[in-house]
Regions:
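Start-transfer (signal-anchor) and selected internal transmembrane alpha helices
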Residues: 1-27
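Transmembrane catalytic cores of multi-pass membrane glycosyltransferases
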Residues: 23-71, 76-99, 135-148, 187-195, ...
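Transmembrane-helix motifs of polytopic, lipid-linked glycan transferases
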Residues: 94-117
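Signature aromatic-anchored transmembrane alpha helix within multi-pass, membrane-resident enzymes
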Residues: 120-126, 217-222, 346-395
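Short hydrophobic alpha-helices at membrane interfaces in multi-pass membrane enzymes
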Residues: 120-128, 153, 158-181, 210-219, ...
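Transmembrane alpha-helix segments characteristic
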Residues: 125-131, 293-314, 372, 377
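Aromatic- and kink-enriched transmembrane "portal" helix at the membrane-lumen/periplasm boundary
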Residues: 127-154, 180, 184, 312-315
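Hydrophobic/aromatic-rich transmembrane helices and adjacent perimembrane loops
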Residues: 151-153, 191-192, 320-354, 393
Length: 402
């Protein structure tokens, strides 16, 4: 019953997820996001945007310690809506978190597509992994996938397309453009993505896939060439100076020593390190176990996901408090969910009794209305549990945003 070459159509399920996630967004109590002002973090956005608003300069007007988009997004929103408002910052954050949820769903479909299973198993895997992944993004609390993760998730979605053999290698070219785009997004994300690009280029060079190598390299050169050409030389010079200054000194002025595992009494810091080890063990297990028949695409993807999870953990090492540790483990948790589910489904298929029960469930799953019931039930438990009581906000959602 297993056909490795069959492409499963996940689009209807993805659309259903997007509809439910959109309803969730519109049921939020938006007043809660405008009651308090974070003088430190909001000030880091408002001050550079105000300076650029009056001086019409970016790096020359402020010390940009996060990134162009990270600290000038309020300016773009002020110009877009023709109003200067602190509340627009929070709307921007909510939209990015909403988009992170959608990107996670799409990313899950990419992984499920390359499973060596039949169509129904792929869909069940996709639904469960999507629900678990989306639960890592919270509007009200700190998220394992914060706003800055948006570009990183988009990078990985495009990365999954590198293994489709097309004539023009457009995905490879777009991936190369992320070199400069990521540096203008958040400079820490820029460092992580450029490091991954270096590994990807090395991989394609070693495997002699020169067309993909040259396409990525062309995207990198073209992206940086356009950036250098389009901005004033003085701005580019300040961009280089400030970025190098941040990379050199961030651990000195922002650093908190990471708590000693098991001895510090800080359970979260110890758990975060154990999660990295656990993710590494799972990755090695499913990659080198030939019986699990992990596809080439997912094998490469899981390796790069593990590398990304280690890179992201640098955020926790730079400032080792609870919030920064939490936002640094998103890719780690996602990898654990994806790998654990894969192993679980593998053993289910090997067990005849469990496999029989799964087949009975699949008969119900074929009915579209049952798909809707399953997704809504899971979302209600894992995602909407803190927002479901605010469904009364839905009819007035757009007025509440204003």
């Amino acid at each position: 019953n297993i056909n490795k070459n069959t492409n499963t159509n996940f689009i209807p399920l993805i659309i259903l997820f997007i509809i439910i996630l959109s309803i969730e967004l519109l049921t939020l109590d938006f007043s809660k996001f405008s009651q308090n002002i974070d003088y430190v973090h909001d000030g880091m956005l408002l001050t550079p945007s105000s300076n650029a608003y009056f001086l019409n300069k970016f790096w020359e007007s402020s010390y940009i310690e996060r990134g162009l988009f990270a600290q000038f997004s309020p300016l773009a929103l002020w110009n877009l809506f023709d109003i200067k408002s602190i509340g627009l910052i929070h709307i921007n954050n909510l939209i990015l978190l909403y988009l992170n949820k959608i990107l996670l769903v799409i990313f899950c479909s990419k992984i499920a597509q390359h499973l060596s299973s039949n169509e129904f198993i792929k869909k069940i895997y996709f639904i469960i992994l999507s629900v678990l992944s989306v639960s890592l993004v919270s509007y009200y609390n700190l998220s394992a996938f914060p706003e800055r993760s948006f570009l990183f998730l988009l990078f990985f979605i495009i990365f999954t397309n590198l293994f489709s053999y097309t004539k023009f290698y457009f995905s490879s070219f777009i991936l190369g453009l992320f070199s400069v785009i990521s540096m203008l997004w958040f400079i820490d994300i820029g460092a992580y993505i450029n490091f991954l690009l270096l590994i990807i280029l090395s991989y394609f060079l070693i495997t002699k896939e020169f067309k993909k190598f040259s396409s990525i390299l062309f995207g990198i050169i073209l992206g940086w060439g356009l950036f250098i050409t389009l901005i004033p030389q003085s701005e580019f010079t300040e961009f280089i100076n400030i970025t190098l200054s941040i990379y050199t000194n961030v651990d000195y002025y922002n650093g908190l020593i990471y708590p000693t595992p098991f001895l510090s009494g800080d359970a979260r810091s110890t758990r975060a390190l154990l999660l990295i080890i656990f993710a590494g063990i799972l990755t090695i297990l499913i990659i080198f176990n030939k019986n699990m028949k992990l596809s080439y695409e997912n094998r490469i993807l899981f390796i790069f996901l593990f590398i990304a999870s280690i890179l992201m953990f640098k955020t926790a090492l730079s400032r080792s408090d609870t919030p920064h540790i939490k936002v640094a483990v998103g890719f780690n948790l996602f990898l654990i969910y994806a790998a654990s589910l894969y192993i679980l489904f593998y053993f289910f298929e090997k067990n005849e009794k469990i496999n029989l029960q799964i087949n009975k469930f699949l008969i119900l799953f074929k009915k579209k209305y049952f798909n809707i019931i399953v997704i809504f039930f899971l979302l209600n438990i894992f995602i909407l549990k803190e927002n479901i009581i605010d469904l009364k906000n839905f009819p007035h959602s757009f007025n509440n945003i204003k």
